[in-house]
Amino acid sequence: MNNDNIDRVLIAGAGPTGMVAARFLAGAGIPVTVVEASNELQKDLRASTFHPPTLEMIDQFGAAQHCIDAGLTCPLWQFRDRKQGAVATFDLGLLADITPYPYRVQCEQWRLNQYLREQLKEFPHAEIHYGVSSVSVTQDADKVALTVADDKDEQVLEGRYLIGSDGAGSAVRKSLGIEFEGMTIPEKYLTLSTPFDFQQAMPDLADVAYLSDPEEWVVLLRTKSVWRVLFPTHNQSDEEITDSALIESRLQSVIPRDEPYEVCLLYTSDAADE
């Protein structure tokens, strides 16, 4: 890793926050080094919605159009009752006079990250290192020193500033003694993807719908190729949550059908991960 430029900005974490920050800095001619604990950019089912203000921001380097092309534009979103149907439908198209993006874009955030990585390759003063975890940080009046570790040893990187975007369990935040007050809701979620078209069974269903129910709420979210379904879980282990028979039963409770549902991807997450 290049450690000979004290004026560089260090970024811990190559999620969308870290990658967008890196792109802005590199575009402004500022040297930047990103370190990411994973061996590759994450490619999972995390957040997949880009709202108008975010699209306006990332449009500065062409990323908004990339997300639009790779995703699905959704001007409508809904609150529904699982038994009674639509309760309220909101139309972002009403914002057309104040934003060039009067809609949500449903596009997996990893697609944005990959696009930004390709852009960062065009800047010789920008670098990304994978399999490198942030351990601790110190600072003085002139610089910041970030201790990082890979599978072999530790190294100290120095820079003018450090951006800590290394997640809910941030080593940067903990190292600086910055409190993270509040609580984590003790809830785990099941998120899955299916090619089944829920709008065929519910013609008035918006592309994004939050279904309320006293027993089990559900989120239905359409992407360009599949529907994502988010369920709460009930004090179960991951093995129980991901049991194929239970998943089939839960999907059948949303829309009963004769054929079994095809599930192409699923994962569980805690509230702190969302």
What is each stretch, according to the model?
Residues 40-56:
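Conserved N-terminal glycine-rich FAD pyrophosphate-binding loop of Rossmann-like flavoproteins
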Residues 267-274:
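Conserved small/polar residues in nucleotide/adenosyl-binding loops
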Residues 26-45:
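Glycine-rich FAD pyrophosphate-binding loop
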Residues 51-115, 119:
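Active-site-adjacent segment of FAD-dependent monooxygenases/related oxidoreductases
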Residues 130-143:
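A conserved short coil-to-beta-strand element within the FAD-binding core of flavoproteins
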Residues 153-161:
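Core beta-strand elements of the Rossmann-like FAD/NAD(P) dinucleotide-binding domain
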Residues 4-15:
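Beta1/beta-strand and adjacent pyrophosphate-binding region of the FAD-binding site
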Residues 118, 143, 161, 165-266:
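Conserved FAD-binding catalytic core of PHBH/FMO-like flavoproteins
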